[in-house]
Amino acid sequence: MDRRELLKNACGLGVCGCALGILGIPEKARAEDTGAVDQRLAFARYQVAKLVGFVAGATTPEACAGILEKTGRECAKLGQLGQFKGNPEGYFAAAKQNWGTDFTWDKEKGTVTIAVAEGPCGCPLVDATRTPALWCNCSVGYQKEAFETIFGRPVQASLKESKLTGAKRCVMEVRLS
């Protein structure tokens, strides 16, 4: 299996926590995932945390962030974002209903602020005690791909707050180009 296949399969299995809500995973199903951790999942979380640390140590922070953003973009491509092309309000409503995500859209400034619900990180591969905050660049890439699909033009995305750095919520900002 090559790297692309691995990433595609991993994202298809729900690796990107941001995608779970958009894909319509009900709250009850997500809540059940917070029970006893399967040893395989615990091992995967450990390995992902180590992998991110190794990549961060072997590259520049910018290169590592870029790799993780690409991972997030691939995850977003596997979702059902196409149904929201030209319909950002529909996307906002679906994410709010399915994931508890809040959106603030300043049409004049061309910015969208995304505030993920409080609580533990939604990514099933995150071990909050081990995973470096660099991992959050995956979510930045997801947001870039999502909003480029929705608005049909390039966007810039940035992470403002992260649960992995101690914030209560993850907050991202998207700027339309």
Predicted feature locations:
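N-terminal secretory signal peptides and thylakoid transit peptides that target proteins
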Residues: M1-V15
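Short terminal or interdomain "cap/linker" segment that borders an active site or interface and mediates
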Residues: A10, Q156-S177
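Bacterial N-terminal signal peptides
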Residues: C16-G21
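C-terminal segment of N-terminal export signals and the immediately downstream linker at the start
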Residues: I22-A56, C75
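Amphipathic interaction/junction segments at domain boundaries or subunit interfaces
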Residues: V55-W135
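Active-site helix/loop of acyl-thioester processing domains in fatty-acid/polyketide metabolism
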Residues: L134-G152
